Amino acid sequence: MLGQALTELPNECCGLLAGRMEGEADAAAAEPLLRLARVLRRYPLVNKKASPTRYLSEERSLIDADRDARQNNLEFLAIYHSHPTSEPVPSRTDLEDNYWDGVIQFIISMNHVPPLMRGWWLSPTDYRPADWQIIDV
């Protein structure tokens, strides 16, 4: 993801992470993903906007990612995009254009050295931090 974000500078990059959930979900948990998510594929998507402040996933790359994920029995676990010159915090546009309910939104800030990535749960009007950690690479 960081390589893609660097390559696509000065514009935002975007993509999807897919894999499988492992273990049983805690029905009483406040967070939808309080269990192990094993990421098995990363799908870099084409930013149709080609903009440093906006992204829009190009339809063909999104369809190809969806087809591959379905063929491999994977579910989309997260969407990611970069903020080339701002903090890794959702913008108003990120909230308004969020069509991925129930998946973590990772934002990579290229404004830091090294780049800083944060995860968020988004709704149309609000966002809250998502607890996550890499436990195996």
Language-model region placement:
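Conserved beta-strand-loop surface patch within small alpha/beta domains used
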Residues: M1-F76, T85-V137
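Residue-level "edge-of-site" marker
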Residues: S82
